[in-house]
Regions:
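The ATP-binding site of the protein kinase catalytic domain
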Residues: 1-229
Length: 229
Protein backbone atom coordinates (compact mmCIF):
# COMPACT_ATOMS: atom_id res chain seq x y z
CA UNK A 1 0.00 0.00 0.00
CA UNK A 2 1.06 3.61 -0.46
CA UNK A 3 -0.10 6.84 1.21
CA UNK A 4 0.90 10.34 0.08
CA UNK A 5 -0.54 13.73 -0.76
CA UNK A 6 -1.00 14.66 -4.40
CA UNK A 7 1.59 17.41 -4.49
CA UNK A 8 2.98 16.46 -7.90
CA UNK A 9 3.46 19.74 -9.82
CA UNK A 10 2.12 20.24 -13.32
CA UNK A 11 3.45 23.79 -13.50
CA UNK A 12 7.23 24.21 -13.13
CA UNK A 13 9.86 26.60 -14.43
CA UNK A 14 9.64 24.72 -17.73
CA UNK A 15 6.04 25.79 -18.49
CA UNK A 16 5.09 28.68 -16.21
CA UNK A 17 5.50 31.81 -18.37
CA UNK A 18 2.61 33.87 -19.73
CA UNK A 19 3.60 36.73 -22.02
CA UNK A 20 0.97 39.37 -22.68
CA UNK A 21 0.72 42.82 -24.21
CA UNK A 22 -1.70 45.56 -23.20
CA UNK A 23 -0.89 47.90 -26.11
CA UNK A 24 -1.61 45.74 -29.15
CA UNK A 25 1.84 44.14 -29.23
CA UNK A 26 4.03 47.23 -28.95
CA UNK A 27 5.41 46.11 -25.59
CA UNK A 28 5.21 42.87 -23.66
CA UNK A 29 5.06 41.74 -20.04
CA UNK A 30 6.08 38.31 -18.72
CA UNK A 31 4.47 36.84 -15.62
CA UNK A 32 5.53 33.55 -14.03
CA UNK A 33 3.37 31.16 -12.04
CA UNK A 34 4.93 29.50 -9.01
CA UNK A 35 5.64 25.79 -9.17
CA UNK A 36 2.55 23.90 -8.06
CA UNK A 37 -0.32 21.54 -8.76
CA UNK A 38 -2.92 23.53 -10.69
CA UNK A 39 -6.32 22.78 -12.11
CA UNK A 40 -7.39 24.87 -15.11
CA UNK A 41 -9.48 27.22 -12.98
CA UNK A 42 -6.54 27.73 -10.61
CA UNK A 43 -4.29 28.65 -13.56
CA UNK A 44 -6.84 31.25 -14.65
CA UNK A 45 -7.16 32.65 -11.12
CA UNK A 46 -3.41 32.91 -10.65
CA UNK A 47 -2.90 34.66 -14.00
CA UNK A 48 -5.62 37.15 -13.08
CA UNK A 49 -4.03 37.75 -9.68
CA UNK A 50 -0.58 38.37 -11.18
CA UNK A 51 -1.99 40.72 -13.79
CA UNK A 52 -3.91 42.60 -11.10
CA UNK A 53 -0.65 42.99 -9.17
CA UNK A 54 0.69 44.74 -12.27
CA UNK A 55 -2.33 47.00 -12.34
CA UNK A 56 -3.66 45.34 -15.50
CA UNK A 57 -7.35 45.06 -14.69
CA UNK A 58 -10.48 47.22 -14.66
CA UNK A 59 -11.74 47.61 -11.11
CA UNK A 60 -14.91 49.36 -12.28
CA UNK A 61 -16.10 46.54 -14.55
CA UNK A 62 -18.41 43.68 -13.53
CA UNK A 63 -15.61 41.32 -14.61
CA UNK A 64 -12.43 43.27 -13.88
CA UNK A 65 -10.10 40.76 -15.53
CA UNK A 66 -9.09 41.02 -19.17
CA UNK A 67 -8.04 37.36 -19.53
CA UNK A 68 -10.11 34.35 -18.43
CA UNK A 69 -9.29 30.69 -19.09
CA UNK A 70 -11.98 28.01 -19.15
CA UNK A 71 -12.36 24.49 -20.55
CA UNK A 72 -14.11 23.03 -23.56
CA UNK A 73 -14.98 19.80 -21.80
CA UNK A 74 -16.40 18.06 -24.85
CA UNK A 75 -13.18 18.47 -26.84
CA UNK A 76 -10.71 18.60 -23.91
CA UNK A 77 -9.37 21.96 -25.09
CA UNK A 78 -8.87 25.27 -23.34
CA UNK A 79 -10.63 28.54 -24.12
CA UNK A 80 -8.79 31.81 -23.55
CA UNK A 81 -11.19 34.73 -23.57
CA UNK A 82 -9.62 38.19 -23.94
CA UNK A 83 -12.07 41.01 -23.28
CA UNK A 84 -9.90 44.05 -24.12
CA UNK A 85 -9.13 44.79 -27.77
CA UNK A 86 -5.64 46.07 -26.93
CA UNK A 87 -4.55 42.87 -25.17
CA UNK A 88 -2.66 39.99 -26.79
CA UNK A 89 -1.00 36.80 -25.56
CA UNK A 90 2.18 35.38 -27.11
CA UNK A 91 2.62 31.63 -26.60
CA UNK A 92 5.87 31.44 -28.60
CA UNK A 93 8.20 32.39 -25.74
CA UNK A 94 10.44 29.79 -24.04
CA UNK A 95 8.81 27.92 -21.14
CA UNK A 96 5.39 29.19 -22.16
CA UNK A 97 2.31 27.99 -20.33
CA UNK A 98 0.80 27.52 -23.77
CA UNK A 99 2.11 23.94 -23.84
CA UNK A 100 -0.19 23.18 -20.89
CA UNK A 101 -3.18 24.98 -22.38
CA UNK A 102 -2.95 23.31 -25.80
CA UNK A 103 -1.35 26.20 -27.69
CA UNK A 104 1.98 26.13 -29.55
CA UNK A 105 3.45 29.32 -31.02
CA UNK A 106 0.28 31.36 -31.51
CA UNK A 107 -0.28 35.01 -30.75
CA UNK A 108 -3.93 35.52 -29.84
CA UNK A 109 -6.04 38.64 -29.35
CA UNK A 110 -9.46 39.82 -28.25
CA UNK A 111 -12.33 37.36 -28.25
CA UNK A 112 -12.88 33.63 -27.94
CA UNK A 113 -9.63 31.70 -28.51
CA UNK A 114 -9.88 27.91 -28.46
CA UNK A 115 -6.67 25.92 -28.30
CA UNK A 116 -5.84 23.91 -31.43
CA UNK A 117 -4.63 20.99 -29.31
CA UNK A 118 -5.88 19.06 -26.30
CA UNK A 119 -4.76 20.50 -22.98
CA UNK A 120 -1.81 18.83 -21.29
CA UNK A 121 -2.57 19.72 -17.70
CA UNK A 122 -2.00 16.20 -16.35
CA UNK A 123 1.74 15.62 -16.66
CA UNK A 124 1.78 12.31 -14.76
CA UNK A 125 -0.54 9.64 -16.14
CA UNK A 126 0.82 6.77 -14.08
CA UNK A 127 2.84 6.51 -10.87
CA UNK A 128 5.24 3.56 -10.76
CA UNK A 129 6.40 2.26 -7.38
CA UNK A 130 9.90 0.82 -7.76
CA UNK A 131 11.74 -1.54 -5.41
CA UNK A 132 15.37 -2.60 -5.77
CA UNK A 133 15.03 -6.13 -4.36
CA UNK A 134 12.67 -7.69 -6.92
CA UNK A 135 12.95 -9.34 -10.32
CA UNK A 136 10.50 -10.57 -12.92
CA UNK A 137 8.65 -7.29 -13.45
CA UNK A 138 8.24 -5.78 -16.91
CA UNK A 139 6.99 -2.39 -18.11
CA UNK A 140 6.30 -1.96 -21.83
CA UNK A 141 8.24 -5.14 -22.57
CA UNK A 142 11.40 -4.19 -20.67
CA UNK A 143 12.65 -5.53 -17.34
CA UNK A 144 11.82 -3.09 -14.57
CA UNK A 145 12.04 -2.79 -10.77
CA UNK A 146 8.39 -1.68 -10.72
CA UNK A 147 6.35 -3.56 -8.12
CA UNK A 148 3.10 -1.61 -8.56
CA UNK A 149 1.59 1.19 -10.63
CA UNK A 150 -1.50 3.36 -10.23
CA UNK A 151 -3.15 6.56 -11.42
CA UNK A 152 -3.40 9.55 -9.05
CA UNK A 153 -7.19 9.80 -9.01
CA UNK A 154 -7.58 12.69 -6.55
CA UNK A 155 -7.30 16.43 -7.09
CA UNK A 156 -4.12 18.34 -6.19
CA UNK A 157 -3.70 18.75 -2.44
CA UNK A 158 -5.79 15.70 -1.53
CA UNK A 159 -4.43 12.51 -0.02
CA UNK A 160 -3.78 9.48 -2.19
CA UNK A 161 -4.57 6.24 -0.37
CA UNK A 162 -3.74 3.42 -2.76
CA UNK A 163 -4.34 -0.26 -2.03
CA UNK A 164 -3.60 -3.12 -4.45
CA UNK A 165 -6.79 -4.29 -6.12
CA UNK A 166 -8.07 -6.91 -6.56
CA UNK A 167 -5.15 -8.65 -4.84
CA UNK A 168 -1.44 -8.53 -4.17
CA UNK A 169 1.02 -9.55 -6.88
CA UNK A 170 4.22 -11.13 -5.59
CA UNK A 171 7.55 -10.96 -7.42
CA UNK A 172 10.70 -13.03 -6.81
CA UNK A 173 13.20 -11.46 -4.42
CA UNK A 174 16.56 -10.98 -6.10
CA UNK A 175 18.64 -11.28 -2.89
CA UNK A 176 19.36 -14.06 -0.44
CA UNK A 177 19.52 -11.59 2.44
CA UNK A 178 17.67 -8.29 2.85
CA UNK A 179 19.49 -5.74 4.99
CA UNK A 180 17.92 -2.72 3.34
CA UNK A 181 15.77 -1.80 0.38
CA UNK A 182 15.26 1.28 -1.75
CA UNK A 183 11.82 2.50 -2.84
CA UNK A 184 11.34 5.30 -5.37
CA UNK A 185 8.58 6.68 -7.60
CA UNK A 186 8.72 7.38 -11.33
CA UNK A 187 6.18 8.41 -13.93
CA UNK A 188 5.12 6.67 -17.15
CA UNK A 189 8.31 7.94 -18.84
CA UNK A 190 10.51 6.58 -16.05
CA UNK A 191 11.28 10.11 -14.89
CA UNK A 192 11.58 10.78 -11.17
CA UNK A 193 8.49 12.31 -9.56
CA UNK A 194 8.89 15.52 -7.58
CA UNK A 195 6.85 15.24 -4.37
CA UNK A 196 8.09 18.66 -3.18
CA UNK A 197 9.13 17.35 0.23
CA UNK A 198 5.89 15.55 1.05
CA UNK A 199 6.18 12.42 3.16
CA UNK A 200 5.31 9.09 1.62
CA UNK A 201 4.40 5.83 3.38
CA UNK A 202 4.89 2.53 1.54
CA UNK A 203 4.05 -0.88 2.98
CA UNK A 204 5.85 -3.84 1.40
CA UNK A 205 4.65 -7.41 1.95
CA UNK A 206 7.27 -10.18 1.73
CA UNK A 207 6.35 -13.84 2.10
CA UNK A 208 8.33 -17.05 2.04
CA UNK A 209 7.74 -19.44 -0.83
CA UNK A 210 7.28 -22.94 0.53
CA UNK A 211 9.41 -25.68 -1.00
CA UNK A 212 8.13 -28.95 0.45
CA UNK A 213 10.80 -31.15 -1.14
CA UNK A 214 13.61 -28.95 0.11
CA UNK A 215 12.12 -28.82 3.61
CA UNK A 216 11.85 -32.64 3.75
CA UNK A 217 15.50 -33.03 2.73
CA UNK A 218 16.58 -30.53 5.37
CA UNK A 219 14.49 -32.32 8.01
CA UNK A 220 16.04 -35.70 7.14
CA UNK A 221 19.55 -34.22 7.35
CA UNK A 222 18.76 -32.71 10.75
CA UNK A 223 17.37 -36.00 12.06
CA UNK A 224 20.46 -37.87 10.85
CA UNK A 225 22.72 -35.35 12.55
CA UNK A 226 20.76 -35.84 15.76
CA UNK A 227 21.07 -39.63 15.25
CA UNK A 228 17.32 -40.03 15.23
CA UNK A 229 17.56 -41.86 11.89
Amino acid sequence: SIDLFNSIPNITNLNNVLRYSKDDGNSWVNIELDTGSYELSAISNEIQRLMANNGDYDQNADNPYFITITANLSELKSIVHISNENYKIDFSVPNSIGSVLGFTNEIIGKGYNESPNIINIIQVNSILVNLDIISGSYVNGSASPTIYSFYPNVSPGYKIVERPSPSLVFYPVSRNEINSMRVWLTDQNNDSIDLRGEQITVRICIREVKNVKRDIVRAIKTLKQDEVL
